[in-house]
Regions:
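Glycine-centered small-residue hotspots that permit tight backbone geometry or close packing
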Residues: 5, 118, 234-238
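Bacterial Sec-dependent N-terminal signal peptides
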Residues: 1-23
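Acidic (Asp/Glu) and glycine-rich low-complexity loops/linkers
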Residues: 19-117, 121-136, 147-156, 166-173, ...
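Short, surface-exposed interaction patches in beta-rich subdomains
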Residues: 163-243
Length: 243
């Protein structure tokens, strides 16, 4: 919530200086958003990217499709941000893009994979439907999906990400979580869920048949739906609550 408020205030403050890029792109089914790129997904019949930005040059912004993957990234920050030494006499370092405010409005026709890196937001208010759907997040991102329908949902999160899926249906979910991630997919009804958790995050899920748990650390797991809880390899203090 704090990140959302900060982003809104930043956008309002810098609105007079904000610039825009509009670009039609080739067909894609996957999106990779690199550090500093906030993403808002919109379903449509014409694939395109509308990007608003400030405190960064247009020549430093890259939008391209390779194969079926749309990549949006800043120069020299494809996977991680390039750092520079501050002139504060203490040797501290900061991102070369620390003042950049960037939001990509991406119109998609179909999606089966999302990847986000850094410390930003990814939002999709329209339905996502795919045979299989993969989500990967690295850093401290806020991810909100309104609706997901898929046969198999796989999520791999590293860091302190916050994932929420409001509703949907899937046969099976598989989570691999590293760090203190916060997951709320209790609105996504599933039959089977497999979890591998390393750290102290929280997981709120909904399963009708079985939840398999491997956990290392002290995660909190809340299970709705009446599934059988199968503790496989649990090292540490996993707090499991079943409704």
């Amino acid at each position: 919530m704090l990140k959302t408020l900060t982003l809104i205030l930043s956008c309002l403050t810098l609105s007079a200086f904000s610039q825009e890029i509009n670009k039609d792109v080739k067909h894609f089914t996957r999106i990779v958003a690199s550090p500093r790129i906030n993403v808002i997904l919109e379903k449509g019949d014409h694939e395109a990217v509308r990007l608003t930005y400030s405190n960064v040059g247009a020549e430093q912004i890259n939008i391209d499709v390779t194969g079926k993957t749309l990549r949006i990234y800043l120069e020299d920050a494809r996977k991680v941000e390039r750092m520079k030494r501050q002139r504060d006499g203490h040797g501290n370092r900061e991102s070369v893009y620390h003042n950049a405010v960037i939001t990509a409005y991406v119109t998609y026709k179909e999606l089966d994979m999302l990847e986000i890196r850094g410390n930003q937001e990814l939002t999709c208010k329209d339905p996502l439907e795919a045979e299989t759907f993969t989500l990967r997040a690295y850093g401290e991102n806020e991810i909100h999906l309104a609706s997901l329908r898929t046969g198999f949902f796989k999520a791999k999160l590293y860091g302190e990400n916050d994932l929420r899926i409001d509703k949907g249906r899937t046969l099976e979910q598989k989570f691999m979580l590293y760090g203190e991630n916060k997951i709320d997919t209790k609105g996504l009804r599933s039959d089977y869920i497999i979890t591998s958790i390393f750290g102290e995050g929280s997981l709120m899920i909904n399963s009708a048949e079985e939840v398999r748990i491997d956990a290392f650390g002290e995660p909190r797991i809340y299970v709705d739906g009446g599934a059988n809880i199968n503790k496989r390899l649990v090292i540490g203090k996993a707090n499991i609550f079943a409704n």
